[in-house]
Amino acid sequence: MKLIIFTGLVLFAIVSLIEAEEESGRVCIPLNGECSKSPDKCCDNINCDCYLRFEKGVQTGRPCFCTEKDVIFERDE
């Protein structure tokens, strides 16, 4: 029984260390990289910009990409 408890504690410690390492050493998302799931991870001087996507009047998604700050994109006609 003690072995099971000890093994559980060791596994918990390992998982906690892995999660802490991922947060402290996280890699940033480069220019034009997708940031839909992690909008705060774009590299310095880059913003995560999102837009709504519609097909036949129905919203089908909200894709997000890392873009340069202060850049405005316009739709081509």
UniProtKB/Swiss-Prot annotation:
Broad class of where this protein is predominantly found: secreted
Propeptide: 21-26
Tissue expression per record: Expressed by the venom gland.
UniProt entry keywords in alphabetical sequence: Disulfide bond, Secreted, Signal, Toxin
Location(s) in or outside the cell: Secreted
GO cellular component: extracellular region
Record's signal peptide: 1-20
GO molecular function per UniProt: ion channel inhibitor activity; toxin activity
Pfam families: Toxin_35
Processing and modification events after translation: Contains 4 disulfide bonds.
Listed InterPro entries: Spider_toxin_CSTX_knottin, Spidertoxin
Family to which this protein belongs: Belongs to the neurotoxin 19 (CSTX) family. 09 (U10-Lctx) subfamily.
Name assigned to this protein: U10-lycotoxin-Ls1a
